[in-house]
Amino acid sequence: MAGTWIFVEQRDGNIRKVTFEMLSEAKKFGDEVAAVVFGKGVEALAPEFAKYGADKVYVVEDDVFANYNTGAYVAQMVAMINEFKPNAVLFAHTFNGRDFASRLAQKLQLGLATDAIKVEVSAGKGVFTRAIYAGKALAKVEVAGEPVLGTIRPGVCEVGNTAGAGAVVKPAVAATAADVYQTVKSFVPTVSARPELTEADVVVSGGRGCKGPDGIKLVEQLADLLGAAVGGSRASIDSGWLGHELQVGQTGKVVNPNLYVAAGISGAIQHLAGMSSSKFIAAINTDTEAPIFNVSDFGVVADLFKVIPTLVSELKK
């Protein structure tokens, strides 16, 4: 058996952080770890995967893989699974990852565990921990079969530094133009100077204490000066102050930046589950009993409407 495969999330050679997270996590299983990358001109990325634990890198290059395409990607992966027989194939729980994994599971007639926050894989079995009931409970889901299939939520695994050999393997191209039943006409990227939430080294999040759009504007000002991503608690998202794609928490996105600033966030357990692994946590809250202070490295008991303008003023100097 060929160990655990991690499907690489990349576009135009830009590798998403979740790929390195999954490679590092798979290294803990004690079996061979391989990165699987489809695309054009992607062989040059192989050394990057080796840095984070890939013992092998399966590289498949062809025009048919230039952009993500469900039919072609599934056809190629099925052929490779039949040839190399991995114990498990894991994907990021992203738009493409969810689509790919579910179509692959259907094609192979196998079970699939999705949106896992923890995973353990052994021969012929995978145990996936998932949040249920809006993050109020955790469920362990066992998936049997070979290979084990699952998707992992970005941000829940630590990026390690255990390197692998990174030996490049080039399987035959199995997908053909006949497998392509959707065509990508163009990509229209979101126009934002801020980093993506799960990729950022610094995150500044606002909660109920922001009291409305004016408070969120302060959070955004601070974030922009720090070169940070903007996030929010469920309260600020449900109030419509920030978009749902910016929710941090067990039912939103999990982040682990070098610095996490929580402004006006009390620290409900669901929110803490999404950011408590951050390297350094700074909190601003008027409530001395706010749970956020229990996980903070630095806390300020004060009104964010006074603290943030002062920080902004100092950072501009």
UniProtKB/Swiss-Prot annotation:
Induction: Highly expressed during syntrophic growth with butyrate (at protein level). Seems to be constitutively expressed. Its main location: cytoplasm. The keyword Transport applies. SMART domains: ETF. Keywords: Cytoplasm, Electron transport, FAD, Fatty acid metabolism, Flavoprotein, Lipid metabolism, Transport. Binds 1 FAD per subunit. InterPro entries: DHS-like_NAD/FAD-binding_dom (IPR029035), ETF_a/b_N (IPR014730), ETF_a/FixB (IPR001308), ETF_alpha_N (IPR033947), ETF_asu_C (IPR014731), ETF_asu_C_CS (IPR018206), Rossmann-like_a/b/a_fold (IPR014729). Its cofactor is FAD. The keyword Flavoprotein applies. Pathway: Lipid metabolism; butanoate metabolism. GO terms for biological process: butyrate metabolic process; fatty acid beta-oxidation using acyl-CoA dehydrogenase. GO terms for molecular function: electron transfer activity; flavin adenine dinucleotide binding. GO terms for cellular component: cytoplasm. It is found in: Cytoplasm. Part of an electron transfer flavoprotein involved in syntrophic growth of S.wolfei with butyrate. Probably receives electrons from butyryl-CoA dehydrogenases, and transfers them to the membrane-bound quinone oxidoreductase Swol_0698. Heterodimer of an alpha and a beta subunit. Belongs to the ETF alpha-subunit/FixB family. PANTHER family: ELECTRON TRANSFER FLAVOPROTEIN ALPHA, ELECTRON TRANSFER FLAVOPROTEIN SUBUNIT ALPHA, MITOCHONDRIAL. This is Electron transfer flavoprotein subunit alpha.
